[in-house]
UniProtKB/Swiss-Prot annotation:
Swiss-Prot/TrEMBL GO biological process terms: negative regulation of DNA-templated transcription
Gene3D superfamilies from the UniProt entry: 3.30.450.40, Heat-inducible transcription repressor hrca homolog, domain 3 (3.30.390.60), Winged helix-like DNA-binding domain superfamily/Winged helix DNA-binding domain (1.10.10.10)
N-terminal signal peptide: none
Function field: Negative regulator of class I heat shock genes (grpE-dnaK-dnaJ and groELS operons). Prevents heat-shock induction of these operons.
Protein name, UniProt field: Heat-inducible transcription repressor HrcA
Superkingdom of origin: Bacteria
Length: 344
């Protein structure tokens, strides 16, 4: 355990270093720390011995080590902090006409990436927690059709498919009837379970040959099990990490799994400093924050960047964008649920 003065010295070195990326000497600290230069140097030496500071090769100053940044995050960083200077810019950046949910999530990801210079990832509500609230089948031609699904009474998902060769018109009607009777209004998690248990038994009552029918169910509903992911600033990862991180960001489903695992049960926010179980994220910092998607649940807003990032400003921006995005989404869903002509 370090002393209060040593904690203050570490915090100040972290703050100064993340702003200038230059080693910090005792003279710079003496302007804020009410102690002699010798006392400060002695404390810096102790912090270095503990592995929280590193000595620069080109000067007598010190800089935080990865362990030092981690100590700062765990003991001094407020995860709910907000810098009012950034609020106006974020609100102004969100001043645009959104025609669908994805527009707002993509915009939020771009704003966070542009304001930090790092990589931003936004996830929609976890698929398992969404509900199937609407389903229809539209026959496009003699040989193909479109499954039109609605999640949470607001999010459309469409899947085009080739009609199985042995299907008649009544078979498409039966397919739709089974969905409406057994799957409609259920969660995506329930649908996944029923496709493996109930549906194979039900299909036998309606169809002579069931193999292609079960394959059709799997094909149509597999889209619901995928995360909706918005990545911005992927190329920025090359400035603070190696090619493995850049390539990892292409695998959006795996990215989503890793980010969800970074939050413990019940946590609303977390900061990992070189602490991810994913090898491609093991040498970077990952900030993760839940934000409200009204009427539906929580999305995930994440920032991936270097270990020596400005944590206070990064946390502030994540919080501000999360709050502004939640407000924007609230307006959007209220509009969807209102009488169009009453609104105007």
């Amino acid at each position: 355990m370090i002393t209060q003065r040593q904690n203050d010295i570490l915090n100040l070195i972290v703050e100064l270093f993340t702003q200038t990326h230059e080693p910090v000497g005792s003279k710079a600290l003496q302007r804020t720390i009410d102690s002699s230069s010798a006392t400060i140097r002695n404390d810096m030496a102790k912090l270095e011995k503990l592995g929280l500071l590193e000595k620069a090769h080109t000067s007598s100053g010190r800089m935080p080590s990865p362990a030092g940044f981690k100590y700062f995050v765990e003991h001094s960083l407020r995860l709910d902090s907000i810098d009012e200077q950034d609020i106006y810019y974020v609100i102004k950046a969100f001043d645009f006409e959104a025609f669908k949910l994805e527009d707002m999530l993509q915009k939020a990801s771009h704003i966070l990436s542009e304001m930090t210079g790092y990589t931003s990832v936004i996830l929609d509500v976890e698929p398992a927690r969404q509900r199937l609230t609407g389903f229809d089948v539209v026959q496009l031609s003699n040989h193909d059709a479109l499954a039109v699904m609605t999640l949470d009474e607001s999010k459309p998902v469409t899947v085009q498919f080739a009609i199985p060769r042995n299907f008649l018109t009544r078979d498409l009607i039966a397919f739709k009837a089974i969905v409406e009777e057994r799957l409609l209004d259920g969660s995506v998690m329930d649908i996944h379970y029923k496709l493996r248990t109930e549906i194979p038994q039900i299909v036998q009552k309606y169809f002579v040959t069931t193999d292609n029918v079960l394959q059709l169910f799997d094909y149509v509903f597999s889209e619901l099990f995928l995360e909706t992911v918005f990545v911005a600033g992927k190329v920025n990862s090359l400035t603070y990490s190696d090619l493995s991180t850049y390539q990892f960001l292409d695998n959006e489903q795996q990215v989503a799994i890793s980010l969800r695992q970074s939050l413990k049960e019940g946590e609303m926010a977390s900061v990992q400093v070189a602490d991810s179980q994913e090898a491609a994220l093991a040498d970077v910092s990952v900030l993760t924050h839940k934000f409200l998607i009204p009427y539906r649940g929580f999305g995930l807003l994440s920032l991936i960047g270097p270990i020596d990032m400005d944590y206070r400003r990064s946390v502030s921006l994540v919080n501000i964008i999360g709050k502004v995005l939640a407000t924007k989404l609230g307006d959007y869903y209220r509009y969807l649920n209102s009488n169009h002509y009453e609104v105007h």
